[in-house]
């Protein structure tokens, strides 16, 4: 039996990872160079709003009919800045993001459109983010209720060795955001998201599963700044071995990864012509493990990702914990 916490895909919140950086103190030539460079990176090199890696396992699987509560604790730490060629920018500092994602999912027992099950869910997140440099200390950071994600339309199909899901959702800017503030938690703009998840059971006994989850983000203009973030393509994936023990919890172990690509230009009054040509890219590889208990119906999971070969963004690692319970 597959872990249910990874049967909830697309649940995410929008976090403006790199808020505006006002009032940096000028501490001589070195400090000026650092501040200008970091401000440029922070304004031009932000990522998409989807928390990468969270849907890497069992991406096409629909939960069983009824209600499921899912919680995911996602930690991202980045201590390198990459330019558009993938070279490390000589800046010392860190960008840390911590997210607590609370999702309530409902799945219908009825079938339609060739055996599809309809479902819907909402994700209410809490977040904390910090941007710190060795020269200036804490530059910006915020914590509190973040942007919430609502998915009113999900269709899921299941065949003998294939599971597929199609989703539409939108990100509402419910998190705190003010142009120029250094304690933002929300993104300050709406995002429409189309996504799909697939799980293919490679072997006849269904002990090996390959999963992939794709999302395309359509961003609107940011409130108060006039900045229109570029659209984003996200990809999570995994290859996992399932051990369905008869009198013990089932175990899933495998490799996992994620990618993210900016597909269109970021534009706005504060964006330079040079910055409109830049496109961020994120890559990561790691592993996952999940444990599922049949009574009560509880699932627990862990994932770790190490990023590499990023461009025009920060680079680091991610640690992710998850759990779910079906009512």
Placement of each model-derived feature along the sequence:
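Surface-exposed strand-loop-strand hairpins of Gram-negative outer-membrane beta-barrel proteins
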Residues: 46-48, 76-99, 134-144
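Transmembrane beta-barrel strands of outer-membrane/channel proteins
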Residues: 69-77, 120-128, 166-174, 212-216, ...
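Short loop/turn motifs that connect adjacent beta-strands in outer-membrane beta-barrel proteins
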Residues: 46, 59-66, 108-118, 157-164, ...
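Long, hydrophobic/aromatic-enriched structural stretches that serve as scaffold segments
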Residues: 95-155
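Sec/Tat signal peptide C-region and signal peptidase I cleavage site
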Residues: 38-44
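Outer membrane beta-barrel transmembrane domains
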Residues: 82, 88, 224-327
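Residues that define the transmembrane beta-barrel architecture of outer-membrane proteins
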Residues: 65, 94-102, 116, 139-149, ...
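Residues on the lipid-exposed face of transmembrane beta-strands in outer-membrane beta-barrel proteins
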Residues: 59, 71, 102-108, 150-156, ...
């Amino acid at each position: 039996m597959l872990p249910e916490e990874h049967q909830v895909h697309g649940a995410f919140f929008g976090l403006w990872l790199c808020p505006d950086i006002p009032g940096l103190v000028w501490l001589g030539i070195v400090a000026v160079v650092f501040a200008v460079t970091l401000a440029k990176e922070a304004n031009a090199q932000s990522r998409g709003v989807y928390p990468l890696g969270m849907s890497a396992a069992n991406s096409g699987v629909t939960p069983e009919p009824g209600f499921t509560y899912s919680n995911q604790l996602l930690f991202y730490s980045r201590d390198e800045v990459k330019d558009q060629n993938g070279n490390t920018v000589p800046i010392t500092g860190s960008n840390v993001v911590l997210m607590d994602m609370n999702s309530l999912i409902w799945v219908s027992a009825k079938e339609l459109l060739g055996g599809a099950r309809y479902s819907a869910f909402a994700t209410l997140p809490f977040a904390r983010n910090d941007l710190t440099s060795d020269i200036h200390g804490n530059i910006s950071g915020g914590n509190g209720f973040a942007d919430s994600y609502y998915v009113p339309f999900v269709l899921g199909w299941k065949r003998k060795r294939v599971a597929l899901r199609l989703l539409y959702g939108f990100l509402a800017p419910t998190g705190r955001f003010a142009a120029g503030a250094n304690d933002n938690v929300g993104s300050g703009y709406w995002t429409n998201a189309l996504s799909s998840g697939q799980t293919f059971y490679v072997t006849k006994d269904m002990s090996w599963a390959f999963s992939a989850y794709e999302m395309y983000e359509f961003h609107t203009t940011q409130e108060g700044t006039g900045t229109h973030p570029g659209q984003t393509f996200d990809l999570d994936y995994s290859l996992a071995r399932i051990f369905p023990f008869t009198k013990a919890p089932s175990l899933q172990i495998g490799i996992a990864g994620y990618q993210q690509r900016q597909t269109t230009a970021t534009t706005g009054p504060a964006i330079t012509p040079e910055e409109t040509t830049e496109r961020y890219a994120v890559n990561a590889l790691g592993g996952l493990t999940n444990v599922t208990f049949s009574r009560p119906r509880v699932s627990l999971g862990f994932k770790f990702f190490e990023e590499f070969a990023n461009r025009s963004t920060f680079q680091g690692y991610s640690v992710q914990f998850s759990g779910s319970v079906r009512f």
